[in-house]
Amino acid sequence: MNAIRTFRRTFVGGYMKIFDEGWGKAKQRMKTAIKPGPGFDVGWNNPNMPLNNYDIVIIGGGVMGWSTAYWLMHKVPRKARGKIGLNVLVVEKDPSYTRASTVLSVGSIRQQFTLPENINMSMFSSHFIRNIREYLSVYEDDPPDVQFNPQGYLFLATAEGAEQLKQAHDTQVALGAKVRLFTKRQIEVKFPWLNTDGIELGNYGMENEGWFDPWLLLMALKKKAISLGVNHCHGEVTDLVVEAKPGVVEGRLCKRITHVKVKMPNSIQYQNVKAGHIINTAGPWAQDIAKMIGIGQEDPMGLDWELQAPLPVEPRKRFVYVFHCPQGPGLDCPMVVDPSGMYFRREGLAGNYLCGKSPEEHEEPDAKHLEVDYDFFNETIWPKLANRVQAFEEIKLRMAWAGYYDYNTVDQNAIIGTHPIYDNLYLANGFSGHGIQQAPAVGRAVAELLLDGEFKTLDLTRFGFERFLRNEPIREKNIV
Amino acid sequence: MNHLVLGYVGLVIGVIVTKKSMVWRVGQVGSVLLMLPATVLVNMNMTISNVSYMMTSDFVSLGLTVLSIWLLPLMLLASQQHMVSESLIYQRVFVGCQVFLTGALVLAFMASDLLLFYIAFESTLLPTLMLITRWGAQKERYQAGTYFMFFTLVGSLPLLICLIGQYQMVGSLALDLSYEGVFQLSYLVNFWWVGCILAFLVKLPLYGVHLWLPKAHVEAPIAGSMVLAGVLLKLGGYGMMRVSLMWGATAMLSSEVFLALALWGIVVMGGICLRQTDLKSLIAYSSVGHMALVVGGVLTGVAWGYNGAMVLMIAHGLVSSCLFCLANLWYERSSTRNLSGSRGLIMIFPLISLGWFLMSLMNMALPPAINLFGELVAMVALYNWSPYSIVYMSLGAVLTAAYSLYLFGMSQWGNTMKNYKNLYTITSREYLLTTLHLVPAIYLIFYLGLMF
């Protein structure tokens, strides 16, 4: 007995303990000595780490990223998915989407644009949303539903703006949008709660316009894309590695993005993902991605002059306020857009309304944080609300939130296409507030551009990056 | 000839200890230098080495040994582009894997003892598995590695058992002593022979057990594809030749079953190739078709069949390896292997189109390429075995020509893809690679001593 106790005390309690301590310390020292990265395994396998080679890397897991991923897999026949070089990785740095534009958006869809491409994109998207069960159903799962309320948009115009509204209406009708012009008298009859002082003309979308839940659309796209074989990881893209080789043109190098450095969350571990094609759908932070490869910086050698044109996307903060008005317009309240840019719509069935306004250039809020400025509501929006609808004089502000527009500072329209220098970089940025309603169409367009080499269904070449090089901005007049 | 294998051992050590800037130089220059002792082998007589009693070489092993030695610097040349960004230790392991693989192959082809051959045969498995699963491109490479490993292992276990059985019956496994064949007259000796040959049929591969090949070839990196298509498949053919001679004609009773599968395989693989959308997959399936003809040639048992199979193996090694290099060249620039995504290349890369052209023509056995001579000789042997086989062989030849032209036409001609604006020029490294494949292939046209 005594011998066993002594044995246990000296051997197990003594030598083994010393050994375990020493071995543990040695392991710790080894771990800190070896610099983490793709070259060495630190001893703990991060299950979130992506593989080291993908054919297509989509930077940004918002609605644009997942829409593109879905359409890429959708275009490939089933037995060839993943086999003929279509491994897709979606990298998202915040899967809870706390600051993403997609989930903080109001989720409206309208065909009332002036550019034909915008109108066509929204028409396809509304068709997509209406038939979302055929597109995005996953086997053995509940069919997706985005709560589409096709209530319509009512654009109001004063006497000065009536001519432009009529021209826009003609463009929209020519492309097949179901919109109808209302005179002042007709508006008064249809919407008796609306105050038509100063209003000359109204353009109302009868079908395919309204609002839906952007979170549900994002989740439906994500689920379907994952079921088709798209890989995703939670990580942040910190760098893009470029290789430059001599090409056919004398003196200019052919540049290609070869690797994407994806950093793991809360860690210094990163993976050097070898990427064949890279799609930038990073939303408001698209310019950070572009800056990593010198887009927008002076080229010291002066050879690649196209690099001087930056990707003109920056985050702009916009507020959305929800208020309650018991005597308000009621169930037939569409999304009303005031000539001043203020908009409001019904939210739910309990007498709540949602409103907002794009601030003027001089009163742009600080985009470093998502704090809500209630003075903006009290001083700028509420007077206009009260002016437009009598009942809105007595309201109670329930809640508000702020989100980012991925604002295209040049012409507030989408940037879709390849970059002239890096031709395995695809861009889908700068939607400036009307991205969620163009997401299905944009995803399909980028997928066609990547897989077929050109746009097949909707020709969006006018939205390419080259317009900044040629200084030919495309202006959209109906910006909300 | 033992010093040749020691040379490779030294090269592995050299790759491990040299500094970072010299790793690839040591690998490439060393492997080129190791070709000089290989020229000693080119005397086509059966030689027993005076350095070691374990190594012999006769005309069967000569061609394949030189082929595997020749392919090592080409493999290193082809893969240095995509290995540039890896960390140093992984580069060392990569180069070391290939050198070790070539050393094991040389040992296998020059072994004079069947058990040594078996050991070398098995030891080529591990470096290839490492190449495929670690440096392959898609995530399907894990499944490809599993298929490759298990097919080969399941096939080679009967080989070990039957070799040991043969040792028990005959008393020795040395090759130069056993040209007589096991002299038994019962039909049971057939099963011993089938057990031996199963490993090689899986390795070749025969049509029914070929599933691992498209997966492994497609998922492997360029070096892996080159060595797989160029040499490892030929291990199967070589092994079949050695083992069949050992057991004798009485053992090859069921050769007709495998011959039938092989003949059918030629036709079916021709058809499958015409339906492929992946560039590498097409070349991989064409390998199965060519090797099916090799199986046919060997299993006839006559000298002409052996000659034809030998020449076909050497020719196919060079042509297939070059085609993989060319496909990889395009893949490195465009990140796609899809045939419909790589059209009109003759307008972008005219000179390397010459490489595509010559290799596609040689693939479909156009005279005067040696592929034709190999096919012709093997076909004559098969016709001698059965006149009805001419149906399958001619159909196979037509389909081979069809898919070779399809490969060339789809990739080179047609409307050039518009979304590739920034493709860098073909480097001289890639031209050298293609030339080094073409030069032996064209030189061998004039070296008829290979066959007769």
Swiss-Prot record, chain B:
GO-annotated cellular components: mitochondrial membrane
Keywords: Electron transport, Membrane, Mitochondrion, NAD, Respiratory chain, Translocase, Transmembrane, Transmembrane helix, Transport, Ubiquinone
Superkingdom of the source species: Eukaryota
UniProt-listed Enzyme Commission number(s): 7.1.1.2
Membrane topology term: Multi-pass membrane protein
Gene Ontology process terms (BP): ATP synthesis coupled electron transport; electron transport coupled proton transport
Membrane-spanning residues: 4-24, 29-49, 59-79, 88-110, 114-136, 144-164, 182-202, 221-241, 252-272, 282-304, 309-331, 345-365, 390-410, 432-452
Transport found in the keyword field: yes
Keyword Mitochondrion: yes
Main localization (coarse): mitochondrion
GO molecular function: NADH dehydrogenase (ubiquinone) activity; ubiquinone binding
Subcellular location(s) of the protein: Mitochondrion membrane
Reactions that this protein is recorded to catalyse: a ubiquinone + NADH + 5 H(+)(in) = a ubiquinol + NAD(+) + 4 H(+)(out)
A Pfam family assignment: Oxidored_q5_N
InterPro entries: NADH4_N (IPR000260), NADH_UbQ_OxRdtase (IPR003918), ND/Mrp_TM (IPR001750)
PANTHER family given in the database record: NADH-UBIQUINONE OXIDOREDUCTASE CHAIN 4
Family, similarity comment: Belongs to the complex I subunit 4 family.
Role noted for this protein: Core subunit of the mitochondrial membrane respiratory chain NADH dehydrogenase (Complex I) that is believed to belong to the minimal assembly required for catalysis. Complex I functions in the transfer of electrons from NADH to the respiratory chain. The immediate electron acceptor for the enzyme is believed to be ubiquinone.
The protein's name: NADH-ubiquinone oxidoreductase chain 4
Origin species: Branchiostoma lanceolatum
